[in-house]
Curated annotation (Swiss-Prot):
Entry comment, domain topic: The presence of a 'disulfide through disulfide knot' structurally defines this protein as a knottin. The cysteine framework is VI/VII (C-C-CC-C-C).
GO molecular function, a single term: toxin activity
Name of the molecule in the record: Conotoxin Cal6.1f
Tissue: Expressed by the venom duct.
Purpose of the protein: Probable neurotoxin with unknown target. Possibly targets ion channels.
GO terms under cellular component: extracellular region
Keywords: Cleavage on pair of basic residues, Disulfide bond, Ion channel impairing toxin, Knottin, Neurotoxin, Secreted, Toxin
Protein family per UniProt: Belongs to the conotoxin O1 superfamily.
Propeptide: 1-8
Disulphide linkage map: C9-C25, C16-C29, C24-C34
Subcellular location: Secreted
This protein's record includes keyword Secreted: yes
Principal location listed in the UniProt entry: secreted
Species: Californiconus californicus (California cone)
Length: 35
């Protein structure tokens, strides 16, 4: 899977700013789940 760090976010399951299954991980929004 491709991991693309995006806008910074706060851990806790923030929706970030995507309608796709992005997850907040290590302070960044990544695709799907944290590796």
């Amino acid at each position: 899977g491709l991991i693309r760090p995006s806008k910074r976010c706060i851990g806790g399951g923030d929706p970030c700013e995507f309608h796709r299954p992005y997850t907040c991980c290590s302070g960044y929004c990544i695709v799907f789940v944290c590796a």
